[in-house]
Amino acid sequence: CRLGRQMGIYEEPRELINAVEGVEIVEMEHSGEDAMCCGVSSMMSCNENARSLRVTRMEEVRATGADTMLTSCPKCVSHFECLKFEGDEAYADIEILDVVSFLARQVNEQKSTLASEPSAVENVEA
């Protein structure tokens, strides 16, 4: 949200995500400049109006068929997680991550994969 709305940065995070092997970005109905607010930037507290915004946004995620929602805003992550922890099981299967955490996870998974592979160095007898 803030990265885009206040700084005009929309494509750079998508480029980083697209660089991850095996990951496909599926845009929601409202994304980029048209993305709907989760309620935090609108300075709403966790009231019914903010909850309604989060539910609408999560329905957009559900419509994509994606199992993970990525956002550049850590406050959005907190707000959407709040919806999940309010006991609304409808969204329990959707993981919500900020882009940096997602990319860090990918790097760590790649490091683990590389560490578990046999070394490419051949053992040569003299």
Cite the ranges covered by each PLM segment:
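Iron-sulfur cluster-binding electron-transfer modules in prokaryotic oxidoreductases
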Residues: 1-126
